[in-house]
Amino acid sequence: MTDNKTVPNGAPILYIVPTPIGNLGDITQRALDVLASVDMIAVEDTRHTGKLLAHFNISTKTFALHDHNEQQKAQVLVDKLLSGLSIALVSDAGTPLISDPGYHLVTQCRQAGVKVVPLPGPCAVITALSASGLPSDSFSFEGFLPAKSKARKDKLLEIAKVSRTCIFYESPHRICESLQDMLDVLGGEREVVLARELTKTFETIQGMPLAELITWIAEDDNRKKGEMVLLVHGYRDAGEQQLPDEALRTLTILTKELPLKKAAALVAEIHQLKKNALYKWGLENLGE
């Protein structure tokens, strides 16, 4: 820890301030300090953010900056920054710019020599990934799936053969159609995780083969409600051997006492599996 000063004097600064995605307890003290200390807060929706600010007794004035006016209003905010005002940028929930407004403002700030200071904080993409059980060493956030089926399938075709985990946002009124398009493009065996209502009372994180997930959602209308994140397991070659959970548990236990290479050989013999596949899994998930 070096300096906990919130808004320094001198050079203009735009603060990127994440806000809770559901649970108000997730806001950081630093975020509250910045929001209370700046001269102005650029917000996606003045009414929505107004409730958040009122909850924490913050009276800083707000400035509406959303998808429909950002390109026109970004320069207005840059001019205010250059005149000496301090400004924080927030979205309705989560980290600004992540499928939310702010890109044009940040770009123009950097071009004008305004310092941009990001605060860490809530983000549905990372929150969902951390609990999904899908590989997290290589992933991409793809934003919202397109609203039209043709465009949606084209997007899914783009990621059909990539090995990384792909993450999407989706709205509840399109979730069934989107999963059906996924089924058509990716097949019923592809593992998909649905994370909905993250950090809220009815938080649900469910992962299973796509065909089973579609059935699971259809069984209860409540499972179609709320803010949603879809996480898609990366492509695996049909010839790539699938490792059973029991074998992976055995390998995990043995590597506590044996070198990975030897443990993989033993598990391969016990479970009639390929040693190289076990060794590769161990390197990726357990370390040498």
Swiss-Prot record:
<keyword id="KW-0808">Transferase</keyword>
<comment type="similarity">
    <text>Belongs to the methyltransferase superfamily. RsmI family.</text>
</comment>
<keyword id="KW-0489">Methyltransferase</keyword>
<dbReference type="InterPro" id="IPR008189">
    <property type="entry name" value="rRNA_ssu_MeTfrase_I"/>
</dbReference>
<dbReference type="Pfam" id="PF00590">
    <property type="entry name" value="TP_methylase"/>
</dbReference>
<dbReference type="InterPro" id="IPR053910">
    <property type="entry name" value="RsmI_HTH"/>
</dbReference>
<dbReference type="Pfam" id="PF23016">
    <property type="entry name" value="RsmI_C"/>
</dbReference>
<dbReference type="GO" id="GO:0005737">
    <property type="term" value="C:cytoplasm"/>
</dbReference>
<dbReference type="InterPro" id="IPR014777">
    <property type="entry name" value="4pyrrole_Mease_sub1"/>
</dbReference>
<dbReference type="InterPro" id="IPR014776">
    <property type="entry name" value="4pyrrole_Mease_sub2"/>
</dbReference>
<protein>
    <recommendedName>
        <fullName>Ribosomal RNA small subunit methyltransferase I</fullName>
        <ecNumber>2.1.1.198</ecNumber>
    </recommendedName>
</protein>
<dbReference type="InterPro" id="IPR018063">
    <property type="entry name" value="SAM_MeTrfase_RsmI_CS"/>
</dbReference>
<keyword id="KW-0698">rRNA processing</keyword>
<keyword id="KW-0949">S-adenosyl-L-methionine</keyword>
<dbReference type="InterPro" id="IPR000878">
    <property type="entry name" value="4pyrrol_Mease"/>
</dbReference>
<dbReference type="InterPro" id="IPR035996">
    <property type="entry name" value="4pyrrol_Methylase_sf"/>
</dbReference>
<keyword id="KW-0963">Cytoplasm</keyword>
<dbReference type="GO" id="GO:0070677">
    <property type="term" value="F:rRNA (cytosine-2'-O-)-methyltransferase activity"/>
</dbReference>
<comment type="function">
    <text>Catalyzes the 2'-O-methylation of the ribose of cytidine 1402 (C1402) in 16S rRNA.</text>
</comment>
